[in-house]
Amino acid sequence: MNYESLIFDIDGTLWDSRALVAEGYNIQLNKEGLSRYCITAETLKPLFGRVMTEIADVLFADFPEKERYALMARCMETENRHLHENPCHIGYPGVRETMEELAKTHRLFIVSNSQQGYPELCISKLGLTGCITGHLCFGDTGTSKGKTIRALMEKYHITSCAYIGDTQGDY
């Protein structure tokens, strides 16, 4: 089937940001005197693909819910800054070239379980600004990936699409 639009996941599909995300979290945790929490790329591996509140529930389970989510929000702010400032290339080989080719015949979109600002960072860091028609994330909708995809489809009047992701939870 020929699809009019293609919707992409970010983490594990377009890039691998786990190491930089872990660094960003640790910067914030150390700043707050919480160095006993040492987040690694391996710590994040089974958590990527989940919504941010679920990640906070796992990483910071010993905090009361309100404090846990506030800490997670601060970690995500630091993560976004760290990703933005770090010159490291974390995109998978050939992603930009592939997306440029696909954009010639399809409208391309991004959907993520991430916080606001993360899709924009991905688009910018990978040089995809001219390729991506639009994006939505958990931070925009506060809901599941499936519902976020549906919201994106409605917003951009998408009638025929394929979703490309890397985990079963993406589908």
Regions found by a protein language model. Give the residues of each.
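Short, well-ordered alpha-helix to beta-strand connector turns
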Residues: Y3, T105-H106, I132-T133
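Acidic di-acidic motifs
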Residues: S17, G165-D166
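Structural motif corresponding to alpha-helix initiation and N-cap regions
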Residues: C38-A41, Y92, R96, T143-G146, ...
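Substrate-recognition "cap/lid" segment bordering the active-site pocket of phosphatases
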Residues: F109, Q116-A162, Q168-Y171
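N-terminal helical cap/lid subdomain that shapes the substrate entry/recognition surface
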Residues: Y3-I10, L14-P93
